[in-house]
């Protein structure tokens, strides 16, 4: 949102210098050799000979080092094939339980039981293993393509390999001449390195950071610790922590893909050179998950099976949305809604930032500028128009003694503590306490506060912001505390700021005596979890939650926007890699603030931004206090572009929604990099300026000022312009094409082999859902064409569960000689029939020049009828290469199977 922006200049430099006055000594002063660790040698090993799916070993320290604290002497390493496509490697202290994310926070396979008080029986079993003296000990199963190899050298290492290609996916084999490649395990410093095969590996993920390219650049440090830093700052740690990466290999099999998750909630640096990836983590354990793929989509499916599938979003959330920090009163809100209506630009959701609150206190209304009676009338009018209303909540609860939320929070003892009493921070209301969302009573408290507010004002969704946690003050560290001042300094804010800076002190305590140090990165995740649960309980509808801070698995509960970007062309560029990153992270409902949040936008930038932003999964215009107003109707050229691109978006709403169904079912993103559909095309690996919606709709925006063309990459196949079906691009192999992109135009193409079910343009999603369907069939030169459609009421909590409350349709099209056949396969068609949805028109693209269409027949059930020739049109495209065929007036029930034959 809108925190006072750290300049990353003088203020940061002052703190940076102070850090070195109070911090620990440097590596070279701690260890004369400059070596931070000497690694471990394997003491004993055992492979489960029954299932052949697990291996355990006890590595013992080779030599002590004094840097960053005392080494842990004995480790336990467990490698387990949890499924045929997932391998887990867990490394921890063999004698003492350490912090790791509990299963009741992030549900996955049950963690191994705690080590016994006496390990002698374990030692006897393992030491008797005849494999201990072997140089390489394998864990392999005939049903899995993944192999774990324990490298029994001094120091030891391990590798993960793909059997089918003999490719090493993760190589933690130490280089005896380079101590930086040794495993180091200190209480507050874990160090693990994997070598990479240079240019064969293409790495994506490890967020959250703003950057100009989706593929990670070499020679950088990616820091993961949630911080309130504007996303307009590239290459620094931002609001979320996602220690997951995807590796797409260009050989030995082009497109062979795997994923790696380090499930750890502590702060960390990940150094990526191109040849190595090194984890430097300040707590917890090493808990690695390897996902076999081998396709990018399969990797995300396997990854989200562990962290949780994305939550379904309500249908209305795919409409266009408007917000601003600085709407001063309810009359301004009314004016904005009226402005969109007058300009005939679709507006689905109106938002309000902290302006609506009484003295910035959660769950209140400003009695002067946003009085209850006027706000109720405003929201009721939105609902009558088929529109929605969303407001913001910040986690800081004002300590004003007359504030009822504060009083109830104190009564139920729900706040985070430090030194035995609630920790006092400062945010917008002034002094605040923060709820401890690990505490069971916090769910009851939060649910009750939301209930009281919904009874006051029936908002449709909640926006949870500032939940990194952001704090306007930096509390002094507890003297001598290595939690507030850990020995290893992660590259916080890009300048190694102390981790206590402008947030909750790491020594604050959560329920269960868990220090903030360990769960800092989980706060946004936990707040989203309780907020979603509260809304489901209170409304019995599918909730909409938007969170700024996220962690692996947050997609189960929330959507995300990319935070406080700026109205610059650079930020427009950053938005695509950020959107694609969150698709990988299992949060498909994502978008950037359209036209830019910080600073004044321009007409040209805003016009180009709405052209792109109309195709973000989450599409919202948002700007900051003190900036020029940037609603889309403020400039006629922007309004015209908005009508055009949002018109296409609204016709594609059934497609967006079907992609949401696919995402919540198997984790696949809505917006995808090109290599998801074309993994064997190596040129797609480095593309950051284009993206796909689903598998075949490609968006190629203008990202520079003053240009009227764009050079776009087209993978092999025939591609058709979704704004003008008579325009097409043919690529026999992948190639770059310069496309016309006048000021009012963005290039959006659909590839052959796809079928889209679309509806009509409208001002709201509610109105769009009442229009007839239009089937766009893009014939393929290489076989059949396919499409899918999922529909329900858009608000039921689950998708596709309760039979009779949803409809799923598969469309198939194929051609032979002078015949084209289009069929539908319907599952649970009753819902579509009850809504009286019909397919009125079918448009067919990709039919080659010379194809003669003389008529058509339609079969529904046992009845076949001859089509009306007057409803059939056939026109050549602009290049004379294809014809565009269209049949109108079909009136086919969507919920009933049909067969359409053109001859």
Curated annotation (Swiss-Prot):
CDD domains: GH31_MGAM_SI_GAA (cd06602), GH31_N (cd14752). Alpha-glucosidase I and II have high activity towards malto-oligosaccharides and starch, while form III and IV have high activity towards malto-oligosaccharides but low activity toward starch. The active site is at residues 465, 468, 564. PANTHER family: ALPHA-GLUCOSIDASE (PTHR22762), P-TYPE DOMAIN-CONTAINING PROTEIN (PTHR22762:SF133). It holds the Pfam family Glyco_hydro_31_3rd. It comes from Spinacia oleracea (Spinach). Keywords: Glycoprotein, Glycosidase, Hydrolase, Signal. InterPro entries: Gal_mutarotase_sf_dom (IPR011013), Glyco_hydro_31_AS (IPR030458), Glyco_hydro_31_C (IPR048395), Glyco_hydro_31_CS (IPR030459), Glyco_hydro_31_N_dom (IPR025887), Glyco_hydro_31_TIM (IPR000322), Glyco_hydro_b (IPR013780), Glycoside_hydrolase_SF (IPR017853). It comes from the Eukaryota. Residues 1-24 form the signal peptide. It catalyses: Hydrolysis of terminal, non-reducing (1->4)-linked alpha-D-glucose residues with release of alpha-D-glucose. One of its GO terms (molecular function) is hydrolase activity, hydrolyzing O-glycosyl compounds. SUPFAM superfamilies: (Trans)glycosidases (SSF51445), Galactose mutarotase-like (SSF74650), Glycosyl hydrolase domain (SSF51011). Its EC number is 3.2.1.20. Gene3D superfamilies: Glycosidases, glycosyl hydrolase (family 31), Golgi alpha-mannosidase II. This is Alpha-glucosidase. One of its GO terms (biological process) is carbohydrate metabolic process. Four different forms (I-IV) may be produced by post-translational modification. PROSITE patterns: GLYCOSYL_HYDROL_F31_1, GLYCOSYL_HYDROL_F31_2. Glycans are attached at residues 64, 219, 400, 491, 501, 600.
């Amino acid at each position: 949102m809108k925190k006072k922006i750290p300049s990353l200049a003088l203020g940061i430099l002052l703190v940076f210098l102070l850090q070195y006055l109070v911090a620990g000594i440097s590596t070279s002063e701690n260890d004369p050799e400059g070596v931070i660790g000497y690694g471990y040698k394997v003491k004993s090993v055992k492979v489960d000979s029954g299932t052949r799916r697990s291996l355990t070993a006890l590595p013992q320290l080779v030599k002590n080092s004094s840097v960053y604290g005392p080494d842990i002497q004995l480790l336990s390493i467990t490698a387990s094939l949890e499924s045929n496509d997932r391998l887990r490697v867990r490394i921890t202290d063999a004698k003492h339980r350490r912090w790791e994310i509990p299963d009741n926070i992030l549900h996955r396979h049950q963690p191994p039981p705690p080590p016994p008080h006496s390990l002698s029986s374990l030692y006897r079993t393992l030491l008797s293993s005849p494999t201990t003296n072997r140089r390489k000990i394998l864990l392999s199963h005939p049903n899995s393509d993944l192999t774990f190899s324990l490298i029994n050298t001094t120091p030891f290492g391990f590798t993960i390999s793909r059997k089918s290609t003999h490719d090493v996916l993760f190589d933690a084999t130490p280089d005896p001449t380079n101590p930086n490649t040794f495993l180091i395990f200190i209480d507050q410093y874990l160090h693990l390195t994997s070598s990479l095969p240079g240019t064969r590996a293409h790495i994506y993920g490890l967020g959250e950071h703003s950057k100009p390219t989706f593929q990670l650049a070499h020679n950088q440090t990616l820091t993961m610790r949630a911080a309130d830093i504007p996303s307009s700052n590239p290459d620094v740690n931002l609001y979320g922590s996602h220690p997951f990466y995807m590796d797409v290999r260009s050989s030995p099999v082009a497109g062979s893909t795997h994923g790696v998750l380090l499930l750890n909630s502590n702060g960390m640096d990940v150094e990526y050179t191109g040849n190595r990836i090194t984890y430097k983590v300040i707590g917890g354990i090493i808990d690695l998950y390897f996902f076999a793929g081998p396709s990018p989509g399969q990797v995300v499916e396997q990854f989200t099976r562990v962290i949780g599938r994305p939550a379904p979003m309500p249908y209305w959330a795919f409409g266009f949305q408007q917000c601003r920090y600085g709407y001063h009163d309810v009359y301004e809100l009314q004016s904005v809604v009226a402005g969109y209506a007058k300009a005939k630009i679709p507006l689905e959701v109106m938002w309000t930032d902290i302006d609506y609150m009484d003295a910035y206190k959660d769950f209140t209304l400003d009695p002067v500028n946003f009085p209850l009676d006027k706000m109720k009338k405003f929201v009721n009018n939105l609902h009558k128009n088929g529109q929605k209303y969303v407001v913001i909540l910040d986690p800081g609860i004002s300590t004003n003694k007359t504030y009822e939320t504060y009083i109830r929070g104190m009564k139920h003892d729900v706040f985070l503590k430090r030194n035995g009493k609630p920790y006092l921070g400062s945010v917008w209301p002034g002094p605040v306490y923060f709820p401890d969302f690990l505490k069971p009573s916090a769910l009851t408290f939060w649910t009750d506060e939301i209930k009281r507010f919904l009874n006051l004002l029936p908002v449709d969704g909640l926006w949870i912001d500032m939940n990194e946690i952001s704090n306007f003050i930096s509390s002094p560290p507890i003297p001598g505390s290595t939690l507030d001042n850990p020995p290893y300094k992660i590259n916080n804010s890009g300048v190694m700021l102390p981790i206590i800076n402008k947030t909750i002190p790491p020594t604050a305590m959560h329920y269960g005596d868990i220090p903030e140090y360990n769960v800092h990165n989980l706060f946004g995740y936990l707040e989203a979890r309780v907020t979603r649960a509260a809304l489901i309980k209170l409304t019995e509808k599918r909730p909409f939650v938007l969170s700024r801070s996220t962690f692996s698995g947050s997609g189960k509960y929330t959507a995300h926007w990319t935070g406080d970007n700026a109205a610059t062309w650079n930020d427009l560029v950053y938005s695509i890699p950020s959107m694609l990153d969150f698709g990988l992270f299992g949060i498909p409902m994502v978008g950037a603030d359209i036209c830019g949040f910080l600073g004044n936008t321009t007409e040209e930038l805003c016009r180009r931004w709405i052209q792109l932003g109309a195709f973000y999964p989450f599409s919202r215009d948002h700007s900051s206090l003190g900036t020029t107003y940037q609603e889309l109707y403020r400039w006629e050229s922007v309004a015209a572009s908005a009508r055009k691109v949002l018109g296409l978006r609204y016709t594609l709403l059934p497609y967006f929604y079907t992609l949401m169904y696919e995402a919540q079912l198997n984790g696949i993103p809505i917006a995808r990099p090109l290599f998801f559909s074309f993994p064997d095309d190596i040129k797609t690996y480095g593309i950051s300026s284009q993206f796909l919606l689903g598998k075949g709709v490609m968006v190629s925006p203008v990202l520079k000022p003053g240009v009227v063309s764009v050079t776009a990459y087209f993978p092999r196949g025939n591609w058709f312009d979704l704004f003008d079906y008579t325009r097409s691009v043919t690529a026999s192999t992948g190639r770059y094409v310069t496309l016309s992109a006048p000021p009012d135009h963005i290039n959006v193409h659909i590839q052959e082999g796809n079928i889209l079910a679309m509806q009509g343009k409208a001002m709201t999603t509610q109105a769009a859902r009442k229009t007839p369907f239009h089937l766009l069939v893009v014939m393929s030169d290489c076989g059949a064409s396919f499409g899918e459609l999922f529909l329900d009421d858009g608000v039921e909590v689950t998708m596709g569960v309760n039979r009779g409350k949803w409809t799923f349709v598969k469309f198939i099209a194929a051609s032979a000689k002078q015949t084209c056949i289009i069929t539908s396969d319907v599952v649970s068609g009753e819902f579509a029939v009850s809504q009286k949805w019909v397919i009125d028109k079918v448009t067919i693209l990709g039919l080659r020049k010379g194809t003669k269409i003389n008529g058509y027949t339609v079969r529904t059930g046992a009845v076949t009828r001859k089509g009306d020739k007057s409803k059939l049109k056939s026109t050549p495209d602009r290049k004379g290469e294809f014809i565009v065929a269209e049949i109108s007036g079909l009136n086919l029930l969507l919920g009933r199977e049909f067969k359409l034959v053109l001859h």
